[in-house]
Amino acid sequence: MRVFVAGGSGVLGRRVVTRLLEAGHDVTASARSDTAAELLTRLGARPSRLDLFDVAGLRNAVAGCDAALRLTTKIPPLMKMRRAAAWRETGRLRNQGARALAEACVAEGVQVLIHESVSFVYADGGEAWLDEDSPVDDGGAMPLREALSGEANARVVTAAGGRGIVLRYGGFYAADSAQSRTMADLLQRRRLALLGPSNNYFASIYADDAAAATVAALRAPAGVYNVADNNPLRLGDYMSALAEAVGARAPRRLPAMLGPVVMGETWKYLPRSQRVSSRRLHDATGWTPSVPDARAGWRLIAAQWAE
């Protein structure tokens, strides 16, 4: 297949590009900088410097492609996530950028569009497993509102006769993720605390497994699919797993009343219990994560950091 990847140099994107190339696909990927272009070239992909909001430029990029993947995000640094303004660029990429890519795909006859979304959009599920038909709720949080509205762009391709596929990923963790590194550093310095209830489920996904799921989704029917570890951990266990992996003490506990002050915008959804199931994607493609849960995943990451 000929594949265009928007966002091919990020934590997820570079893993997806590598897997696509290993599978024998012809890959072109967008690059925002010379450094990103050099990385993509080293991987074996063709870098494309273009405006991700320009339909005409995107039409040229996807012309002749069988599939396009929108993996573009600009997640703010961990310490800035509390501010709604920090999410504006990601919101633009999830909506205006995604709309431009969807329009380009329809105009050029690209049959498959994969759109990156997040599993945080689900309402609190308590102890229940959440599938793709479970209720969603943006909670008044801009990141979730933009994520849900952005998903409509995949349906544009489906309506035109192609396959629009939305992947709702759990929170990524990876050795080369700045966010993962920051979390570990803050824990080791006793500057990262556990706010509110610790028994709520937290959906996460090891980045390598997220990439494998993304490539597998190329053969999935149109629709929405969750991408998460098979065994979601409760938030307290998730944080303890990271602490144990990096040799830190368990995080301090702070009362929930401090959540809005400390977490800001993200407090509108992070305390939810989200026991997310990826069975639908497994049934459609055979994909299964290689890392069963974040406890095993953080141990792998800590070992990579120690090398």
Regions found by a protein language model. Give the residues of each.
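Mid/C-terminal beta-alpha module of Rossmann-like enzyme folds, strongest
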Residues: R2, R15, A211-E265, W305-E307
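N-terminal Rossmann NAD(P)H-binding glycine-rich loop of SDR-like oxidoreductase domains
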Residues: V3-A23
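NAD(P)H-binding glycine-rich loop region in Rossmannoid oxidoreductase-like domains
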Residues: R32-Q96, A100, A104
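Conserved Rossmann-fold NAD(P)-dependent oxidoreductase catalytic core, especially the SDR/UDP-sugar
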Residues: W87-E89, Q96-A141
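Conserved beta-loop-beta element that borders a ligand/cofactor-binding pocket
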Residues: S117-V118, E151-A175
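Substrate-positioning beta->alpha
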Residues: E146-S149, S177-A184, L195-A216, G223
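Conserved C-terminal active-site "lid" loop/helix of NAD(P)H-dependent oxidoreductases
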Residues: A207, G236-S240, P260-T288
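Amphipathic terminal alpha-helices
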Residues: P292-E307
